[in-house]
């Protein structure tokens, strides 16, 4: 017992002794070496001890990784050769690395790998071959890697994968195939990956998602298909993925989606569909998704939305349907069921009008963006009962007027953007102008709302207009005036209308008559002038006489 204890202690002390570190390397930790520079073909000449467990090589010169580079390193567990110029790996290079758990050959120039290169690494758990120039992979390359959990083949030039390539990788949890030239995935390619959690296939050239391709991936939580050329998705493609929480389908060529495509995706918390040429959405698309908080449908070809299209997304907080010029109308209940929605982005579309109850039931809405549309008017009750609303963006539309109480009963409102509209500063704007003058702090000063007309008021900020005018005509227009023979009446051209300090007075009709006798008027006018002159002379004469008399009295009193 004592002999065994002493033997273990001696072996431990021997192992704890630092090994001689090669001159071109750094050995900060025991059993670990970090080397940079030098020639790839002369790694064996570095004199690395065979009892190392970690080796990091980077910045190596161009060359072929030789078979004797790691001879005798039977206890090595982590080998990382990255950011170098390795063009190829000789057969048998890793034959002695029987305990290796991590192999990283990232960011090199490797174009091909020998078929049996990895056969001795049965304990390998992580394999990173990303950022190389691989054009193809032998179908038997990974057959012995039964313990592999992470495989990165991203950022290569792969355009084809053998159907049996991953057959024995039953413990795989991460598979990254992004950034390649793949156009399709063969049937059965992912049939053995029941434990796979993350599948990254974005930035390829895939044209379709075929039926059954993903059926074996019951543990999958993240699926990335964005930046492909996908035109079609098989109905029920995601039905067998009960744990899926993140799905990206943005930046593809999808013109339509199968009905009920996401009906069984109850655990989704992230779904992207933006930048697809979607022409319409099916009436039933989403199932109950209690965890989905964001949905973006930007840059599509949608013309409208189905009524209650999002009714099952009860926990949605952010919804964006933007940058879709063909979107010109929305149904009454487009956002029904979104009681938790906080941000609604509808900017940069082609909306010309909005239904009265579009925002009904969105009691927690804080921000709504309707900027850069073609809106000419808003319903009076559009923002009614939105007590949490803080920001409303209506700039860059074609608004001419708004109801005076359109923003009434919004206690938390802090911002209203109204610039770059076609404000018609006539009498009809009066009620809204009254509200605006009481809430100038809410309107952005960088792009203030300005009058588009009429006349001299064009270009003036709304709040710079003068106050109320008693002559502003009522809703039914100005009172009728007695007119001469109707045949002699002719309306004055708007350019000849009288100027006024108020923006709406110009709209009052002005008429002229032909052959009217104004001589009585002028006679009376001159008579008044004559009378006024006579009265003025009499007053001046009387004041002079009074002044003289006053001075005479003063002198007499002074002498007496």
Swiss-Prot record:
Ranges where the LRRNT domain occurs: 17-50
Domain LRRCT: 421-474
Chief location of this protein within or outside the cell: membrane
Gene3D superfamilies linked: Ribonuclease Inhibitor
Keywords: Blood coagulation, Cell adhesion, Glycoprotein, Hemostasis, Leucine-rich repeat, Membrane, Repeat, Signal, Transmembrane, Transmembrane helix
Membrane topology: Single-pass type I membrane protein
GO biological process annotation, one example: blood coagulation, intrinsic pathway
Side of membrane Extracellular, spans: 17-523
UniProt protein name: Platelet glycoprotein V
Organism field: Homo sapiens
């Amino acid at each position: 017992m004592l002999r065994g204890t002493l033997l273990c202690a001696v072996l431990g002390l021997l192992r704890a002794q630092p090994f001689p570190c090669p001159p071109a390397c750094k050995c900060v930790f025991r059993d670990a070496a970090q080397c940079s520079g030098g020639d790839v073909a002369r790694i064996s000449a570095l004199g690395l001890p065979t009892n190392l467990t970690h080796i990091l090589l980077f910045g190596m010169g161009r060359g072929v990784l030789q078979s004797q580079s790691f001879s005798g390193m039977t206890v090595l567990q982590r080998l990382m050769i990255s950011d170098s110029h390795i063009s190829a790996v000789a057969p048998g290079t890793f034959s002695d690395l029987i305990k290796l758990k991590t192999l990283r050959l990232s960011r090199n120039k490797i174009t091909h790998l020998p078929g049996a290169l990895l056969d001795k690494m049965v304990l390998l758990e992580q394999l990173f071959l990303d950022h190389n120039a691989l054009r193809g992979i032998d179908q038997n390359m990974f057959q012995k890697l039964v313990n592999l959990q992470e495989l990165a083949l991203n950022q290569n030039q792969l355009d084809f994968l053998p159907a049996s390539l991953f057959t024995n990788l039953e413990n795989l949890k991460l598979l990254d195939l992004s950034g390649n030239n793949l156009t399709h995935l063969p049937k059965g390619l992912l049939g053995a990956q029941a434990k796979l959690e993350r599948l990254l296939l974005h930035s390829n050239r895939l044209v379709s998602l075929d039926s059954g391709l993903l059926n074996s991936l019951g543990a999958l939580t993240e699926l990335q298909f964005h930046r492909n050329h996908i035109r079609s998705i098989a109905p029920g493609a995601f039905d067998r993925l009960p744990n899926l929480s993140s799905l990206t389908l943005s930046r593809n060529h999808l013109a339509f989606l199968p009905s009920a495509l996401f009906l069984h995706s109850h655990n989704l918390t992230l779904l992207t569909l933006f930048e697809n040429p979607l022409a319409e959405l099916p009436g039933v698309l989403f199932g109950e998704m209690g965890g989905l908080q964001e949905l973006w449908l930007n840059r599509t070809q949608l013309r409208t939305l189905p009524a209650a299209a999002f009714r099952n997304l009860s926990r949605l907080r952010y919804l964006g349907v933007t940058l879709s010029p063909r979107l010109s109308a929305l149904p009454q209940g487009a956002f029904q069921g979104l009681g938790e929605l906080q941000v609604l982005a509808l900017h940069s579309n082609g909306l010309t009008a909005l239904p009265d109850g579009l925002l009904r039931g969105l009691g927690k809405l804080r921000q709504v963006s309707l900027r850069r549309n073609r809106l000419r008017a808003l319903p009076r009750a559009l923002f009614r009962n939105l007590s949490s609303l803080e920001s409303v963006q209506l700039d860059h539309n074609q608004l001419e007027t708004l109801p005076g109480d359109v923003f009434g009963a919004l206690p938390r409102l802090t911002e209203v953007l109204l610039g770059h509209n076609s404000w018609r500063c006539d009498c009809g704007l009066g009620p809204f102008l009254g509200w605006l003058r009481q809430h100038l702090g809410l309107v952005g000063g960088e792009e203030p709302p300005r009058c588009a007309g009429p006349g001299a008021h064009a270009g003036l900020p709304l709040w710079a207009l003068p106050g109320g005018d008693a002559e502003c005509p009522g809703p039914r227009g100005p009172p009728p005036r007695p007119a001469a023979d109707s045949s002699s009446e002719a309306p004055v051209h708007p350019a000849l209308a009288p100027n006024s300090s108020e923006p709406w007075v110009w709209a009052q009709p002005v008429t002229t008559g032909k052959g009217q006798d104004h001589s009585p008027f002028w006679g009376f006018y001159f008579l008044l002038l004559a009378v006024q002159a006579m009265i003025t002379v009499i007053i001046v004469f009387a004041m002079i006489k009074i002044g003289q008399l006053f001075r005479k009295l003063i002198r007499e009193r002074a002498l007496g």
